[in-house]
């Protein structure tokens, strides 16, 4: 399964498992940036068995609009610009991880070679859930996650997971990712300090405004 890394494989910045696996599955969202869904890749004799197993017992009618959206996503992934995007995703993730480590946070695995990283916040006296809540309060999205040999239960956890795909799509670069790492570190170091939270939330809002999801003209603005 290459659900998380399909876009990086398509962009040529991560090795492909397809030549080595009998069956490969992946999502069409995440780094591939298509609609929510999935796909199965295999040799014809195997894919016939997959299709027979799925339909009609486990799959309903096809959603043609989603199939069309997947086709567009695949077409975009063939463009040279998509390879540039994939490279930027990895560069941004490395910049984020490097700066977090400079600020004293441990990255499980010592860094990242793709778009995600797992940050150990338990070493700072926080649970993953508390860190998640504190970061969400200043509009920094993440999710709690267990770390290896975690002594906390899953709903508490000792880590948070971060990724660079969405912010790269918005146009943020390595400089902004280093700044995001500073904001995260500031919050982790002082999760209950309202003055720190207020400052960080304001700076996050300014950054988000500088990299809008849509141009004003695309949503009926001036």
Language-model segments: what does each one mean?
Residues 1, 24, 38-39, 70, ...:
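Buried hydrophobic positions in well-ordered alpha/beta secondary-structure cores of metabolic enzymes
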Residues 2-104:
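Conserved PLP-enzyme active-site core in the AAT-like
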Residues 47-52, 71-77, 110-117, 157-164, ...:
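Short acidic (Asp/Glu) and glycine-rich catalytic loops that position anionic groups and cofactors
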Residues 61-64, 81-88, 100, 104-111, ...:
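Flexible, glycine/charged-enriched surface loops at secondary-structure junctions
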Residues 71, 88-94, 110-120, 151-153, ...:
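A glycine-rich phosphate-binding loop feature that marks nucleotide/adenosyl-phosphate handling sites
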Residues 91, 154-222:
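PLP-dependent enzyme catalytic core of the Aspartate aminotransferase-like
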Residues 106-171:
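Conserved PLP-binding catalytic core of the aspartate aminotransferase-like
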């Amino acid at each position: 399964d290459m659900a998380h890394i399909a876009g990086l494989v398509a962009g040529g910045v991560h090795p492909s498992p397809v030549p080595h696996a009998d069956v490969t599955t992946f999502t069409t969202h995440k780094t591939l940036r298509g609609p929510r869904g999935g796909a199965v890749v295999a040799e014809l004799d195997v894919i016939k068995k997959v299709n027979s197993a799925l339909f009609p017992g486990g799959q309903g009618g096809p959603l043609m609009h989603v199939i069309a959206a997947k086709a567009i996503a695949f077409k975009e992934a063939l463009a040279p610009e998509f390879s540039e995007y994939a490279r930027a995703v990895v560069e941004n993730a490395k910049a984020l991880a490097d700066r977090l480590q400079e600020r004293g946070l441990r990255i499980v695995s010592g860094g990242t070679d793709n778009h995600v990283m797992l940050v150990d916040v338990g070493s700072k006296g926080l649970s993953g859930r508390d860190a998640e809540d504190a970061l969400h309060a200043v509009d920094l999205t993440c999710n709690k996650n267990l770390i290896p040999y975690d002594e906390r239960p899953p709903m508490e956890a000792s880590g948070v997971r971060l990724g660079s795909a969405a912010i790269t799509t918005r146009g943020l670069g390595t400089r902004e990712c280093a700044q995001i790492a500073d904001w995260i570190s500031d919050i982790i170091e002082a999760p209950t300090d309202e003055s720190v939270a207020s400052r960080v939330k304001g700076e996050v809002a300014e950054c988000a405004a500088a990299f809008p999801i849509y141009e004003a003209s695309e949503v009926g603005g001036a």
